[in-house]
């Protein structure tokens, strides 16, 4: 019996143009060619989706877990002009306002009642209420990435934007962030008190780097600030009140494009991710149960003049994101048309959540809650990672974790493929492997010494695997 020859090829990759966590990492949004969707971050669940016609979106930015979203048009056929910000009320399913500028919008940051818009050389801030009111405007250096970050905790005031000189950061203090509205029964805990007024006026400019900035990040409180530059090797942590350098952390030795930095909500750790396909975790607080790696020559630096490199702190944990080929490809993929949109298969966004630990020592005391990471890739991968040392972040609780999120619209769950251990990156047997895999292997050999891997607790898919996009 003769059978016709069949070829096995990978499925068409999901085209996700942008992924955004809300400030508290309770939900995230995903923009695709078909529209956008809102998901619960953990447990992963599709909450609602909007299939749009007439163009594509570059970004959908959520305002906490409210129904208000900020839309930016983009792609090869933008739904909205790139110089507009659309305020979309998803409860109404329609646009409620728009902001128009004379140039393309580069970035957005928001908190309750406020929206900051980054343009090429300035940042404009608006107050949101019954009407949208222009609050102020600040000049910056050339800012093609649209960098800005805003503190979102109750009573926080900090907005950070690029300075007028390359590598500098401006610290702007807005009116205090209001507390979230209470929709259910009153909480049992006392309301958060505003912090005491600083003894002296806080700094307004930090000379963070000598090269162009690539990321700006702040924790919810706004007490700290993280900066990275185009060199992509160092992460600097600053005190936002005094402007002093608190820590200097080293991602690696090879030049890389750092995509983002995220503070743990209690500011005891940070995570960093880049185009190397690796998520690095650093400890910030002493006595946190985890310590960053250091050179064996580090203890000698107070006594012997050694190069600064030998005093560097390296991540204590990391996780290498498997390439798309490790999931869905076992042969050469079909050729792509020249006009097809291309998504970086290893570009990702990372956020912190709190989840029950898999290591329960005393079942009678209730679930042990720990900080974990959620990694979202632009090809629709959802990873839940636990840290190698979780004792510092674990707390006992008898109350189940819940998020203030509306009920789901879609009843079809995503495909689940849970795993209990990290899976090594596959760099052979597929033409989907990244063009810089060799450099990543070198980084893994150098930076992987004495480091520990995060544990992959759960892997799932979002996007087209939910039946949309």
Question: Which residue stretches match the model-derived regions?
Answer:
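Beta-strand-rich domains and repeat architectures in extracellular enzymes and scaffolds
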Residues: 5-35, 54-67
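Asp-box/WD-like beta-propeller blade repeats and closely related beta-sheet repeat scaffolds
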Residues: 92-153
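Per-blade loop-tip surfaces of WD-repeat and WD-like beta-propellers in eukaryotic adaptors/scaffolds
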Residues: 40-47, 86-94, 125-138, 164-204, ...
């Amino acid at each position: 019996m003769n059978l016709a020859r069949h070829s096995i090829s990978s499925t068409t990759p999901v085209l996700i143009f942008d992924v955004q966590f809300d400030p508290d990492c309770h939900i995230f949004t995903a923009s695709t060619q078909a529209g956008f969707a809102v998901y619960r971050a953990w447990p992963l669940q599709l909450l609602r989706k909007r299939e749009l016609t007439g163009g594509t979106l570059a970004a959908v930015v959520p305002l906490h877990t409210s129904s208000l979203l900020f839309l930016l048009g983009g792609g090869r056929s933008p739904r909205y002009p790139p110089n507009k910000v659309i305020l979309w009320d998803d409860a109404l399913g329609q646009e409620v306002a728009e902001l128009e500028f004379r140039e393309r919008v580069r970035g957005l940051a928001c908190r309750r009642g406020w929206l900051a818009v980054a343009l090429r050389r300035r940042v404009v801030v608006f107050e949101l209420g019954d009407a949208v009111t222009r609050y102020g405007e600040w000049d910056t250096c050339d800012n093609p990435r649209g960098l800005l970050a805003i503190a979102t905790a109750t009573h926080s005031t900090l907005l950070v934007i690029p300075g007028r000189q390359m590598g500098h950061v401006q610290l702007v203090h807005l009116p205090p962030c209001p507390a979230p509205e209470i929709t259910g029964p009153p909480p049992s805990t006392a309301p958060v008190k505003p912090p005491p007024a600083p003894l002296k006026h806080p700094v307004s400019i930090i000379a963070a780097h000598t090269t162009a900035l690539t990321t700006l990040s702040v924790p919810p409180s706004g007490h700290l600030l993280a900066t990275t530059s185009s060199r992509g090797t160092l992460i600097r942590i600053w005190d936002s009140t005094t402007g002093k350098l608190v820590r200097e952390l080293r991602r690696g030795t090879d030049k890389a494009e750092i995509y983002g930095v995220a503070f743990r909500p209690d500011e005891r750790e940070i995570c960093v991710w880049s185009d190397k396909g690796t998520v690095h975790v650093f400890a910030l607080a002493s006595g946190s149960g985890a310590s960053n790696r250091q050179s064996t020559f580090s203890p000698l630096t107070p006594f012997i003049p050694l190069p600064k490199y030998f005093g560097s702190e390296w991540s204590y944990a990391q996780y290498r994101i498997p390439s798309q080929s490790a999931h869905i490809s076992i042969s050469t993929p079909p050729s792509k048309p020249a006009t097809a949109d291309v998504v970086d298969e290893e570009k990702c966004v990372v956020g912190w959540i709190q989840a029950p630990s898999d290591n329960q020592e005393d079942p009678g005391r209730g679930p042990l809650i720990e900080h974990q990471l959620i990694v979202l890739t632009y090809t629709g991968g959802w990873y839940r990672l636990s840290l190698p040392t979780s004792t510092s972040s674990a707390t006992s609780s008898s109350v189940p974790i819940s998020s203030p999120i509306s009920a789901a619209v879609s009843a079809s769950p995503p495909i689940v493929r849970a795993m209990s251990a990290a899976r090594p990156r596959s760099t052979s047997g597929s033409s989907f492997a990244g063009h810089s895999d060799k450099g990543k292997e070198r980084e893994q050999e150098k930076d992987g010494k004495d480091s520990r891997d995060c544990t992959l607790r759960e892997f799932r898919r979002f996007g087209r695997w939910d039946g949309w996009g």
